């Protein structure tokens, strides 16, 4: 996973528990065991972080079945899912699986995407999609990597008129 995420979470005092990745994504059985262990000591995870599509560094893609099971576990243990899907636009030659957020009807997925991988690395722009109760709590932690206003306006214009053609 992206190292910047871990350093940021550690600065916020969040404990991180890693779950191994299999050929078709996160090991859901081990995740279930971990969540059950946490529940036994009255700990509710702040969220479950995953890169389901082109996971870094393995390049694995979580199967649709595992995405659905992940949502079921998140519901069972009342844990939001942070879906880091910044590499999803890099899929070539095969069908892109639906995002976890698209499969979720409980509104517990925070979806993170990036224009840096799909349009231009120099832009260093990303975005979050979440319902307002979640997004309002996340906004105070946003950072700016120095992307200028002009670049943001150019990207906005591009997305408004041409983004779907680009994909």
Q: Which residues fall in each region the model found?
A:
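PLP-dependent aminotransferase class I/II
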Residues: 110-167
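Substrate-binding/gating loop at the entrance of the active-site cleft, primarily
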Residues: 1-14
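Active-site phosphate-binding strand-loop segment of PLP-dependent enzymes
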Residues: 26-92
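Short beta-strand->loop structural element characteristic of the AMP-binding/adenylate-forming
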Residues: 15-23
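Helix C-cap/helix->beta junction micro-motif
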Residues: 12, 76-77, 107
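Catalytic cores of nucleotide-enabled group-transfer and carboxylate-activating enzymes in metabolic
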Residues: 98-99
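Hydrophobic residues in well-ordered beta-strands that form the structural core
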Residues: 18, 81-83, 155
């Amino acid at each position: 996973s992206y190292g910047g995420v871990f350093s940021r979470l550690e600065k916020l005092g969040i404990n991180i528990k890693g779950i191994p990745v299999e050929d078709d994504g996160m090991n859901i059985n081990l995740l279930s065991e971990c969540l059950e262990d946490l529940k036994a000591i009255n700990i509710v995870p702040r969220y479950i972080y995953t890169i389901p599509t082109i996971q870094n560094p393995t390049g694995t893609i979580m199967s649709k079945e595992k995405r659905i099971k992940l949502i079921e576990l998140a519901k069972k243990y009342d844990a939001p899912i942070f879906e880091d899907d910044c590499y999803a636009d890099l899929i070539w030659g095969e069908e892109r699986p639906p995002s976890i957020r698209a499969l979720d009807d409980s509104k517990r997925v925070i979806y993170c995407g990036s224009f840096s991988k799909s349009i231009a690395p120099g832009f260093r722009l990303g975005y979050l999609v979440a319902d307002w109760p979640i997004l309002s709590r996340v906004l105070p932690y946003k950072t700016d990597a120095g992307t200028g206003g002009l670049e943001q306006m150019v990207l906005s214009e591009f997305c408004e008129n041409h983004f779907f053609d680009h994909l």
